[in-house]
């Protein structure tokens, strides 16, 4: 970029040092420049009505201080720029004042009333243009001025401005207000127009060539005012010099606007994409809103419908329950009466039965006690008999032992006597120590024995001779006594036995008959024994009698049971049967009835089973249909939705498939039309893009070649031509319209051979790009084209092109046409794309419908089938209920028949007993016989043993053994005599044994020792025998004692048991019952039977009591249930009525608002209330979030939460629908249904997303193209600045010999341009980012390549927009050539006042000229604008400087209005002498106009 600056300086120097290049041809037509003709001030301070005619060059206002020069210039400036925000006349403003400066110096220059400042000008067309302002002071402290701008056209030249604005009233003139002025010209050719905006006023002045630039905004007016202000007060204005770029460099609105349009389009595109995303989210929110609101309301709607249906069903069920409770209550009351009657009967029977049971139980106890007593008696009898036997045995043993004791005692006594005798003999024998002594002792003993015998026997004459005789006599006598003793002993034994037998028999008789006299014992025993035989025979018959009685009692009991059963049967069967024939006939009848009932019941059961199977099948079908119904309703909703979307009525699945095929065909056709329109739109976009280029060229290589050759495209030189001239110039150059204008063809010729890539035909024209003229060809303009004479032999005819390459205005005009066409094509493309999207969506819906719902959508309505099934099921239920009642009756009949048959089965086997009337008598007779037999049996059992014992010894009772003591005494006496005789025999035997000893009378002395020894031996033997006898005695005594003790124990035990036996016999006699095994069994069976009957009665009574309690409780419950059922029914009925009112309101709302089909979602009818409430609650939670920002919907939703008013939910749904309807854009979406709108919105948003994405790709601009545009624009403006510098040549003010403009590219921006051109890949991250706009990316790149620069608080977008303006890339400075300093920067401090004023005026002229060039393409080609500048206080310029200004004005065809003191008199131009005078207390300015009164 430094090379560019150096090149610019070289070009500038060359231009200044070289002569100007002559144009290739002189223009054939010239346009005169417009001029300001006059300035008229009406009712200004000092000027009531004054017109200043303005010179074509310089108009000078000369006068002293206060003469009115500044007021005149203020009037001119006010008429030129009527903007109170800018006007500020400083030389009349109080210094340092704040409040008094509010009028900006204008208020004090006016007089009260209507004031005018009017400019009259003559434009290039020769039109008289009158523009001005009406001013009027506004009363108040603020010193405000009201300004109204206006214009007048077609005013004749003969009419002066003052005559137009005033009217003659007598000798005075009146200033016309604007309204009167307007009325004055109504209906005439004069066009009066009042402007309500300064922009319109300035647009009028620009169009007619009054001002050089179109002032579109307040910023443009500010620039213009600052330029006028700078020229007014003179000098180098720092405001202008600091912003020369804004004044001299055109804004290049086309490029900038293109960038801005591109950026705004991209931004709008992205914003639209974001808005689409937001809209999609809003759509999703709306979709969710409509979905959730539908779920919320429809779930509650269906729940209320279900609840209403359920409430009606509940009401019917409660009414049915009420009636059933009433019938149950009546039935239970009937049962209570029957059960109470039966309980009363059972209570009556229970007492008698209980008495019988107690009696039977007591009888059983007596029998059991009797049996126990009998067992004890038998046991005791056995024990007593055994004890008697033992006692007898013991008695015999005791007697034997007694005899043994006596024998042992006798033997012991004999042994003692013998020992004593032997001891005595021993003592005697011991006295003789020899045999003699012993014999003598024996002799003495023999003598002693003889004496003893004599003494014992009483035989004094006893001797050895008669001893044997006496011995024999006494032995015989002893034998007789022994026999007598034996006899007596036998008699005694017999007597003892007789006594024992008598005592025993007597005891037995006493035991049997009680205590009787001993003398009567025999008679009693005999009578007992006589009766005992019969009693034993009767006792043997007791068993048979007992068996017989048991049989009779059993039969009697069976007869009683049969009578009882018959009575019960007759009572239950309501009959009076008595005979067996009647019972058997009835039995056969009931058996046949049972078979019939069983057959009928089996048939009922079979029919019921069949009906239950049918009901089960129907239930299965119903459940299957109930499962299918929601899906079917969903399919129907989808089908209805699909029919609405397609606008078709589908009758079958084939029609859906056919429509789907047709939709595919339609989609292909729409796709082809869309693609065709897309290609047309792309072609138009390409043409628009080409025409949007600054040079209008469609070949990029031409720009590259122009830069390479240092030339300019011909189209750029004619870029500012007007719309009317553009076709002419395009046709004039023909194919050469793409030519490149270069300064020297020869210098370019050498480069042509080196070209690698260039167009097929490349046209080069030699000429100065800065002063190019169109007089190149000899041409003649025709109606439709131009005939160009290329040479004498070659003409070319070119028609006016419809789209001229030359002229930006023409291209822009055609661009408008192309854009309009593109918009139309884009709209058509959008419609076709919408149609394609719609077709695709419809095909998608169709595919989804076919895949999901086609199998169910055209099937029959499952609810109708469900209703039919429900009707069949109800009929079956009714039949089943009826069959259940019939079956219950049959079962009751069956149970009754079975019960009767069961009772008959019990009665019939006993029916023969009912006719046996003698059974009771026979039983009584048998019982009497059994009683006798049992008494005999009991007597035999009790006394049979005694009688058996008594029978063999009964004879002992004949005599009473009372002489037993005498016999015993005789026996003892005989025994004593026998003992004495035996002693005598023994003594005699001892004498006989000692008879030999009598012969020892001689040997008494010689046989003593032998005898002693013999005696000692005998004594020892005797002692041993005595010890043995004593031992035997002791043993016999011990045995006797033992036997006696045993006998005593047996006797006491026998007495005790006998006593116990007597007590048991008395007790069993007291019981009066004879027990046997059969009796116990009979008593027990009787007791058990009665117990069973009593238990049955009690259990039946307990059951009946429980049933009565249950029935009473059931009656109470049924009574409460009946009341509750009645109350619930009435409550439910009221609820149904209330719900019906609310439901009617809901239906009315939904039907009137056409939302019923949205709410009546039958697929929800099969869900439970909890599931529907869950759906509604979930939707409510989502809706609270969705409508949180919408107060109306939020309030409506809050009101809808009241469960008591379901209509509020419908109202909320209607509000949601209305809310969504209001937000449907009818220009885009052609429907009132929000759901359809959402569907269409999805299609449209999808299409817009695709379209905007592709548009963003088209709108994207490369950084390299931006750099090329900026470089090209900078180069063009540099060339223009060079051209402007030519107009400042030979300007001299004092020491200043030249003024020029220097334009340089800033280094930081040059680096940016290089980065844009060459760093494409390096900085790709910035320009390819979707988050950054191009301006922001450009600002980020600027910061990246210039990291040392602080951006401050400005945003990247602002910096980027500034970087898109080429003016920010350039630095403009004013340099002056002054003396020896050479070229230096123009500053007021380095110049004198005159030099500064001249230099500043030169700069201003350059600015005005630049504005004219900039606005040339916007102005008609036959108009050149007026040029006028001001200069107040020109006294600071010398005469030479003033002459220089005159020359400058003459050369640049410019007017100048200056104010000078009285001593300044320009040589040329018009001079007005202003003198302020006072006449008659009225102040006015006296004006005298002169022309060229200065020195020659």
From Swiss-Prot:
Location in the cell: Cytoplasm, Nucleoid
Alphabetic keyword roster: ATP-binding, Cell cycle, Cell division, Chromosome partition, Coiled coil, Cytoplasm, DNA condensation, DNA-binding, Nucleotide-binding
Segments of this protein annotated with the region Flexible hinge: 694-811
The UniProt record lists the keyword tRNA-binding: no
Gene Ontology cellular component annotations, sorted alphabetically: cytoplasm; nucleoid
Biased composition range(s): Basic and acidic residues: 1082-1091
Protein family: Belongs to the SMC family. MukB subfamily.
Record text about domains: The hinge domain, which separates the large intramolecular coiled coil regions, allows the homodimerization, forming a V-shaped homodimer.
UniProt name for this protein: Chromosome partition protein MukB
Annotated source species: Actinobacillus pleuropneumoniae serotype 3 (strain JL03)
Lineage start: Bacteria, Pseudomonadati, Pseudomonadota, Gammaproteobacteria, Pasteurellales
Protein encoded by which gene: mukB
